[in-house]
Design a protein with these regions (language model features):
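Flavin-dependent oxidoreductase catalytic cores
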Residues: 1-95
Length: 95
């Protein structure tokens, strides 16, 4: 979480208006949100609220670190298109 926030802080210092976090298409954060790939048995796995915990922690820490005027774009997959992926209802709730 802190590494994401540190990268965002460096982007802000370099003059960028915001960052885009890749949470789609099989990237690391997508593997946390998709039931098919998230087989964790801790507070980051299982129930939907647990599977979205890491992305939410990251976004909140970037917001805390960089301020309300810093743009944060979080890219999600609309539909996983694989058996066992995030369902439409979960995707809408996550968005």
């Amino acid at each position: 979480v802190q590494d994401f926030a540190n990268c965002a802080r460096m982007a802000r210092r370099a003059g960028y208006d915001g960052v885009e976090i890749m949470g789609s298409e099989g990237y690391l954060l997508h593997t946390f949100t998709a039931p098919r790939t998230n087989r964790r048995r801790d507070h980051y796995g299982g129930a939907f609220v647990n599977r979205i915990r890491l992305p939410l922690e990251i976004v909140r820490e970037i917001r805390r670190t960089c301020g309300r005027d810093f743009l944060i774009i979080y890219r999600i997959s609309l539909l996983d298109l694989v058996e066992g992926g995030m369902e439409w209802e979960e995707t809408v709730q996550f968005a």
